[in-house]
Amino acid sequence: MIAEEREYATYSSMPSVSYKIIEHLMTNPKAEIIWKLLKYNDADAYTRPNLTQKEKAALIYKGEAIQADYRVFFDFMMDDAETEMNTILRIYPAEVYPINRVTGLCTINFEVFTHSKINHLSNYTTRVDVIIQTLIDVLNGADIGGIGVLFFDNQASRYDKIQTIGQKPYKGKLLKMSVNMG
């Protein structure tokens, strides 16, 4: 039996990339610190008890008109002016670079923003850096069901990087990771 070759890439998994990554972060024990730092604004947030699945789900934006109650979004940029001191995580497919007709490289952006007055933690680290490092720890090389293996690797994708973003009072970092898809 001859295997049938797909003629062209459809990138059918692209719309579910953000959700699948969040699903992985909600169930991975090493990602608990991310959820604590998103929910709690105090300098000792990392010492708080782990969140329940229900508490984590309550932080994820579901399309309501008011965004202020949420911390996790599946698109780019801050849509509304933030009036409270909090931390925000945005995860979305940013770019697709076709490699050939059946496969391409999808760059996933992870934007972490926090109000400058709550960025420093009592253990002499910063909220933004801890979240970015934990995202790499949990997701680099992880097989995200239905999407593929995420990677942070300059040899595999010259687009992977971390850069500083934001403006006062919200500062942040952008992590770019990649996944092959077709």
Indicate residue ranges for each PLM-predicted region.
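Small/polar-rich, solvent-exposed N-terminal microdomains that initiate assembly or binding
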Residues: 1-100
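Short, flexible/disordered intra-domain loops and linkers
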Residues: 6, 119-126
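Soluble non-cytosolic domains of exported or imported proteins
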Residues: 12, 126-129
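Acidic-leaning, charged glycine-interspersed low-complexity segments
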Residues: 82, 128-182
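Extracellular structured ligand-interaction cores
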Residues: 86-88, 105-107, 170-176
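Residue-level recognition of well-ordered beta-strand positions that form the cores
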Residues: 92-94, 109-113, 176-180
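Short glycine/proline-enriched loop/turn "hinge" motifs that connect secondary-structure elements
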Residues: 97-105, 167
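Short acidic, glycine/tyrosine-flanked loop/strand segments centered on an H-E-D-like triad
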Residues: 103-120
